[in-house]
Structures are given as C-alpha cells and as structure tokens.
Amino acid sequence: MAPQDTSPLSTQIEASGRPALPDVSLRITEALAFDDVLVAPAYSQVLPGSVDTRTRLTRTISLNIPLVSSAMDTVTEGGMAIAMAQHGGMGVIHKNLEIDEQAAQVRRVKKFESGMVVNPLTIHPDQTLADARALMNTFHISGIPVVERETGRLVGILTNRDVRFATDPALKVYELMTRENLITVTAEVHPEEARRLLHRHRIEKLLVVDDAYRCVGLITVKDMDKAQAHPLANKDELGRLRVAAATGVGEDGHARARALIAAGVDVIVVDTAHGHSAGVLAAVERIKTLSNAVQVIAGNVATPEGAAALIAAGADAIKIGIGPGSICTTRVVAGVGVPQFSAVLETAAVCRAHDVPAIADGGIRTSGDIVKAIGAGADCVMVGSLLAGTDEAPGEVFLYQGRSYKSYRGMGSIGAMARGSADRYFQQEIKDTLKLVPEGIEGRVAYKGPVSAVLHQMQVNARFRRITGAGLRESHVHDVAITREAPNYRQEG
C-alpha cells in the first residue's frame, strides 16, 4: 500500500498539475478571538497593588511591565521608545526611516539616561572655545571633561558657566576651564554616595576616574533625577534605557541591522507580515552572526509550525499575530490569519517548550485583552492603537468636528508602504503606488495625552471562559475612523 500523503493542502498537486481537491475528512477547527473569552473570577489573596508584572521579552532581556510599543510609523520613534523604557516596557522604532535616521533614533534613546556616561566626550586644553561650543551644541551637553592630549589624564572640566560670557571663539580651553577642586570618584561609587557628593559641593556632574586619573565616566544630576522619577525603568547593565528597532529581509534589511547594532540597539525585530517564510528565516540566521549581545525577535506567525521554524533559525522571541490589528485588513484582503486568542494559545505552547518568550502582537483594545493574551501563554503584548493618540507618538494633533485626534495607520496601508514598509508585505519591488496591494487602512484615533496615563491602566493575569463569537469583527477594521479607504477594502454598514 502506498503511504498516505500528509503534506499540506497547498503542496498537494495532482499528476495533471492541478491542485488536489481538499480532503473532505479534514476537520475545520474552532478558533477564538479575544472577545470570545472572559476571565473566570477565582479566590485570590493578592491585592492589585502587590502584583508583580515583571516578565521576559527575549531569552535574556526582561521587562518590568509586559508592554511593547509596535514598530509603526504613527506609534514608535525615539520619544515613544524613551517613555516605554522609562515605565518598564520597551519601544520598537519603526523602519520607515532612512537607515542613518533610524540609527540616530536608537542613539537618542541610549543617550537619554545613563547610570554613568561611559567614556564621555572629552576636549583637550589647547582646543578653542569654538571647538567646545560646537561639541556642546551638536551633542546637547552642558559640560566636557578636559584631558591631556598625550596621556588622557584629567586636568579640568569646561561647563556652560565657564563659557557663558566668553566672546572670543579663539580662546583656548585651558584659559576658561575649571581646574581647581575637581570632585572625582571611582566607577565603584554607590549611587547614594554620588548623590551626597553632588549635593554637598553644589555641582551637577561627578567626574569618574581610573587609577591613572583618566576620565572614564560622568555621573550627572539629571540622570540621577530621572532614575529616581522612574524606578521601574528598563535599563541595560550600563544604566542606559533599552530600545528595540525593526528591520526587514534581504540586503537592505541586513545593512539596516548592522547600523542598528553599531548604534547600540538592544533588540532587532525582523518585522514582516508572514514570518514563516524562507527570507525571514535566512534574515534571522544572518543577524544572529553579527552580534552575541543583540537579541533577535522574529515574526509574525500564527501557527506552532511557524514559531518552531523561527526558533530553529535562532530567534530569541516570537511575535504572534496575523491580521488582528484594528487597522489591519490582511484577513479580509488575503483570506489569511488565525483569530488572535487561539493563535497565541497554540503558538505560545511551542515557544514555552523551547523556553523562548512569545509576544502577542495585535488585537489589544483594552487592558482586559492584555490579561487574556498573557493567560493564553504570551509573555508580553505589543500594542499600537492604544498608544497612537498619545503625546509621544509621532504626528501632530488635529481637530475634527471639534475633537482632538492623531493619525494612525497600518504598516500595510498605501501611505506606509509608499514610505518604506512595502517589504514587510513582500511588495518592495513595486514602485507604482497604484499597484500596491494594501493590507491596512489609514485613520484617526482620539488624542489621549501623555502615554504614562495610558500605561498606568494596563497590568494583570488570569484564566478564561468562552462567551461569544467575535472572530469576524476582530478580522475587520475596528476602533478607528477610516479617513482614507484602501482600494481593496471597504467596511459596510
């Protein structure tokens, strides 16, 4: 007897070359969206204020809150990434930017806050006031350690107070710098001791020196104040905020990944609409060879098989979700996808078996959906529309019918693909925007104010019970007002 063909329907071909007829014995399984389930209340001794929301983002990087902002051009750039990291999450800077510009956004986040500025910018005594001001203006700093040109030994510090009233750009640094009574510490100084020294001497910067009196770091009042204001901030081992950035497949994606790693990014996200594909698997494998320190998140997938393939390629976390987003039309336009609750439930099980974190990406409309996603097996969730109307999201606030809004669009919308995200949907070779096949729409969301107020509303855990059928609604555009229709999608009613 010939062995039974167990290959997927899409690969079963008759001898004539025509696709085989589907096996009528195949069972169509039920799949659930977030709206199909509710948390079943149960006895608890844990008060909401004592809930621990720490979780993993990747194999080696953790989060203090289970929230990640999505790599969308109306959601995450430097400002959102800073705010997310300060509150304990992480932001993924979108790739609809030139490579240099995206790398600059990463550097902005990494330099925004430091426990100690390692290897700070320095200047030599024989340089000029013009040189000093150029450094201060370019890097937005108010003080520069002065070191000997040959030995690197610390000889002074030049601050705004030293140069404020100087008018001759040819003046030498040694004529202006503060050289007496320099307050220095070693790299092992305790934060409380550093704060005490700053207060006692009424200064804003502590110079960190090594045994040879070379300047190896800088501790500033601003950074200490930021650390005190945001105790849950997600930081690396040097006290800098953590940040992720998106890239694509192919040579452009690889070049982008190299630039992002050079800029100091913590996590690279290989961001595509269909992660279970040869190009994505190859991209993950190549990026993993670039750095041992940088973690790689890959996606999106909605099946256990897709997750297993990405894990085998070396992915450090898996992004789950095809089509659940409020501005995504993939399921309707392409007829592809899995309702998000079931996708997370089934796919996260594979991730858990390999000790790889799972990220639920899309379909999160309320804090209750976060609870359901985490209970289904996700380690954290990626959100877009919930953050799109905040101050930190890119774009301006505009008035419509007397109310304030901000723009929000899917990365599969015509506008986003024309700007640079077409490769996410494997349409990068199409130059005529009229020939692009969009899988998202452009819309508006209500203005929400600072992101801190939104983040405050989202953190919990639990179990579920099915209640209703809501998969179709999740597959369609929801929770935004469409301002520009895609040519292949129209919502009736």
Feature-to-residue mapping (PLM):
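Alpha/beta catalytic cores of nucleotide-metabolism and tRNA/nucleoside-modifying enzymes
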Residues: 1-43, 123-124, 185-186, 196, ...
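Catalytic cores of alpha/beta
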Residues: 79-82, 255-263, 296, 302-320, ...
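Short beta-strand/loop segments at the ligand-binding rim of alpha/beta enzyme cores
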Residues: 62-69, 115-120, 180, 236-246, ...
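Bateman/CBS regulatory modules and CBS-like beta-alpha motifs in cytosolic regions of diverse proteins
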Residues: 51-63, 70-72, 101-141, 146-149, ...
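Terminal amphipathic helices with adjacent charged low-complexity linkers/tails
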Residues: 95-110, 146, 151-167, 198, ...
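Glycine-rich phosphate-binding active-site loops on the catalytic face of alpha/beta enzymes
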Residues: 86-101, 265-277, 316-334, 364-398
